[in-house]
C-alpha cells in the first residue's frame, strides 16, 4: 500500500527542506530488555518524551512503553480494555479511571494485578511521590527538555515512591534527543558536573515561526497501518521527492522549514546576541 503526501513548501534555495524521522520499526520498542535491566540493576525505570509538542508520535511511543511494562495485564484484559475504550497512549491514570466503569469486584481485581506488576517490575520514577503519580501515569507529565537536565543535575537520579532520590535508567526512544543527552552524561562522567559559574550559559533561540521544523509535523505524522511505501510528491510536477519503505506500526514523521521562519530566526538570534553581547552560533542541520 502507498501513502502519498503532496507538498508545496519551497525554500528560497529552490528545493524543499524536509526531514524524515522513523522512530519505531514494526511498532516495537526494545522496552522489555530495559525494564528487565532496571529491575536487575535496582534502579528506577523512566521514559522521557515530549508528548506536549509531538502530539501524534510521542503518545503512541508512550503507549508502547505502558503496554510493555504491564504486558501481562494488557494481554489478559485486552478485550475488556477495548470494550471500555481504554487507550494505552493516554497513560495509567486514564486506564485506572476507566476501570470505574466496571463492577467493583472486577475493577478491584484488575487494579490488584496492576499493583502486582509494579511490585514485580522495576520501580518507577515518580512525578509526585506523595500522590503516587508515576512516570507512566500521564504522557505529558514528564517533558524531556526539563526532566533530563534535572536528572543529570541530580547525578542521574529521580524521585522514588518514598520521595527520595534514586539512581535511574532513562529510556529516550527518540534518537533526535537521545544522542544529545548521552553525550552530556558521558561528559559529566569524564569531567564532573556542569557548572554554569565557570562554563557560562548559552541562550537558545528556537526555529518556531509558522510551524517550522517539528512544530508543523502534526498533520504529517502517521502511525502506519500496513507495510508499504510512503512517498512525498511535488503536487505541481508529480516528481517523487523522497520515499521510504515502512512496516505496520511504524511512525512516519515529516518536518518542514520555510524561508520566512529562517529569516525571522536569524533576526531574533542576531538581536539577542547584540543585546547580551555574546557570539551567535547558527545550527541548522
Predicted features, each with a name:
Residues 1-10, 14-63, 72-285:
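Extended, well-ordered protein cores
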Amino acid at each position: 500500500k502507498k501513502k502519498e503526501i503532496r507538498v508545496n513548501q519551497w525554500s528560497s534555495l529552490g528545493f524543499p527542506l524536509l526531514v524524515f524521522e522513523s522512530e519505531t520499526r514494526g511498532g516495537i520498542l526494545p522496552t522489555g530488555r530495559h525494564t528487565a535491566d532496571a529491575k536487575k540493576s535496582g534502579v528506577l525505570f523512566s521514559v522521557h518524551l515530549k508528548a506536549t509538542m509531538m502530539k501524534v508520535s510521542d503518545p503512541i511511543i508512550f503507549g508502547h512503553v505502558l503496554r510493555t511494562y504491564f504486558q501481562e495485564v494488557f494481554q489478559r484484559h485486552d478485550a475488556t480494555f477495548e470494550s471500555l475504550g481504554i487507550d494505552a497512549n493516554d497513560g495509567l491514570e486514564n486506564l485506572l479511571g476507566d476501570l470505574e466503569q466496571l463492577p467493583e469486584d472486577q475493577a478491584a481485581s484488575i487494579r490488584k494485578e496492576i499493583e502486582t506488576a509494579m511490585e514485580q517490575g522495576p520501580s518507577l520514577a515518580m512525578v509526585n511521590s506523595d500522590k503516587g503519580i508515576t512516570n507512566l501515569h500521564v504522557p505529558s507529565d514528564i517533558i524531556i527538555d526539563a526532566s533530563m537536565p534535572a536528572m543529570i543535575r541530580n547525578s542521574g537520579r529521580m524521585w522514588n515512591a518514598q520521595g527520595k532520590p534514586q539512581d535511574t535508567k532513562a529510556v529516550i526512544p527518540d534518537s533526535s534527543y537521545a544522542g544529545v543527552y548521552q553525550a552530556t552524561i558521558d561528559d559529566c562522567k569524564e569531567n564532573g558536573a556542569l557548572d554554569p559559574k565557570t562554563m557560562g550559559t548559552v541562550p537558545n533561540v528556537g526555529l518556531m515561526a509558522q510551524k517550522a521544523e517539528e512544530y508543523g509535523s502534526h498533520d504529517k505524522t502517521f502511525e502506519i497501518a500496513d507495510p508499504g511505501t510512503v512517498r512525498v510528491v511535488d503536487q505541481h510536477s508529480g516528481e517523487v521527492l523522497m520515499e521510504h519503505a515502512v512496516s505496520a506500526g511504524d511512525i512516519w514523521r515529516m518536518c518542514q522549514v520555510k524561508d520566512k521562519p529562517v529569516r525571522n530566526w536569524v533576526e531574533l538570534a542576531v538581536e539577542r546576541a547584540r543585546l547580551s553581547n555574546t557570539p551567535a552560533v547558527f545550527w541548522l542541520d
